[in-house]
Amino acid sequence: MSKNKDDAPHELESQFILRLPPEYAATVRRAVQSGHVNLKDKLSIELHPDGRHGIVRVDRVPLAAKLVDLPCVTESLKTIDKKTFYKTADISQMLVATVDGDLYPPVEEAAATADPKANKKKDKDKEKKFVWNHGITLPLKNVRKRRFRKTAKKKYIESPDVEKEVKRLLSTDAEAVSTRWEIIAEDETKETENQGLDISSPGMSGHRQGHDSLEHDELREIFNDLSSSSEDEEDVNILDTEEDLERQLQDKLNESDEQHQENEGTNQLVMGIQKQIDNMKGKLQETQDRAKRQEDLIMKVENLALKNRFQAVLDELKQKEDREKEQLSSLQEELESLLEK
């Protein structure tokens, strides 16, 4: 069976549940089941202008009625052969009729206020009066309080603000990739310098003491050699011996001074390379942390364009990490070569 495009779409019926006192409900049920022709004379419904109150007449007996909102939607089905069911409506309201109610309740006049928040709160309080806390069966008594939690408030952000924030983050990431920065704490630097001076002082004093003792030993050997040579060679000229002694002493002192200067230069070079290694380790750790945060961000983002952009930033961070690792390894090799000397 082909469907004609000109056919009007099927519309659901507008329905609600009518709840009556037991004696009146039995009268209406019998009239419906018997197929009474004049059902309109048996049952009539009249709603007031507010749309929430009305009058239900059963056998010309007026009952006060109130239209309430059910906790959830109930589907209404109908069947012809009791085998196939067709959905006819979604029922979300119920008209409750009572004998003791006021047929014409007083109309509440809303006080006009300039504050929109106050008006909104009053409307919300007014709607609460017509909220039905129970279901349509006995087991669902107080179902709204027992099973339904309060709706969580969500803070919605306008789409232009979101786009601006995304663009700002992307531009910040692009700038951060091409920027090299270093954090230096002045207090920590001073403490490190003081510790370095305190540590190097004993070493330098020990080196000088060792250097002085070495000079004394060398002088002692020279004097011993001279004394032995003077005993063996009594004919050597005294002036020549003194000149040779001064020359040898000067040579020894010059060699010791050169060695001391060379050691000081090596120590300064080692300290400089060690400082560069520490700085490079800090930069490498910072780059690795940024790469890790970028990977976490890529896992959370679902937009394909943003994911590609973040992936490009991550690739640049990986390349930067490789370069820093190479620089760190070269500095460590240079330091090892100096220490071996």
UniProtKB/Swiss-Prot annotation:
InterPro entries: TAF7 (IPR037817), TAFII55_prot_cons_reg (IPR006751). Pfam families: TAFII55_N (PF04658). The modification Phosphoserine is found at S171, S200, S201, S213, S256. GO terms for molecular function: histone acetyltransferase binding; histone H3K27me3 reader activity; nuclear thyroid hormone receptor binding; nuclear vitamin D receptor binding; P-TEFb complex binding; protein heterodimerization activity; RNA polymerase II general transcription initiation factor activity; TFIIH-class transcription factor complex binding. It comes from the Eukaryota. It is found in: Nucleus. Signal peptide: none annotated. GO terms for cellular component: cytoplasm; male germ cell nucleus; MLL1 complex; nucleus; transcription factor TFIID complex; transcription factor TFTC complex. CDD domains: TAF7. Residues 187-212 are annotated as: Disordered. Keywords: Coiled coil, Nucleus, Phosphoprotein, Transcription, Transcription regulation, Ubl conjugation. SMART domains: TAFII55_N. One of its GO terms (biological process) is positive regulation of DNA-templated transcription. Residues 236-341 form a coiled coil. Phosphorylated by CIITA. Phosphorylation at Ser-256 by TAF1 in early G1 phase disrupts binding to TAF1. Ubiquitinated by TRIM26; leading to proteasomal degradation. A motif ([KR]-[STA]-K motif) lies at residues 3-5. The [KR]-[STA]-K motif is specifically recognized by the SETD7 methyltransferase. The TFIID basal transcription factor complex plays a major role in the initiation of RNA polymerase II (Pol II)-dependent transcription. TFIID recognizes and binds promoters with or without a TATA box via its subunit TBP, a TATA-box-binding protein, and promotes assembly of the pre-initiation complex (PIC). The TFIID complex consists of TBP and TBP-associated factors (TAFs), including TAF1, TAF2, TAF3, TAF4, TAF5, TAF6, TAF7, TAF8, TAF9, TAF10, TAF11, TAF12 and TAF13. TAF7 forms a promoter DNA binding subcomplex of TFIID, together with TAF1 and TAF2. Belongs to the TAF7 family. Component of the TFIID basal transcription factor complex, composed of TATA-box-binding protein TBP, and a number of TBP-associated factors (TAFs), including TAF1, TAF2, TAF3, TAF4, TAF5, TAF6, TAF7, TAF8, TAF9, TAF10, TAF11, TAF12 and TAF13. Part of a TFIID-containing RNA polymerase II pre-initiation complex that is composed of TBP and at least GTF2A1, GTF2A2, GTF2E1, GTF2E2, GTF2F1, GTF2H2, GTF2H3, GTF2H4, GTF2H5, GTF2B, TCEA1, ERCC2, ERCC3, TAF1, TAF2, TAF3, TAF4, TAF5, TAF6, TAF7, TAF8, TAF9, TAF10, TAF11, TAF12 and TAF13. Interacts with TAF1; the interaction is direct. This is Transcription initiation factor TFIID subunit 7. The gene is Taf7.
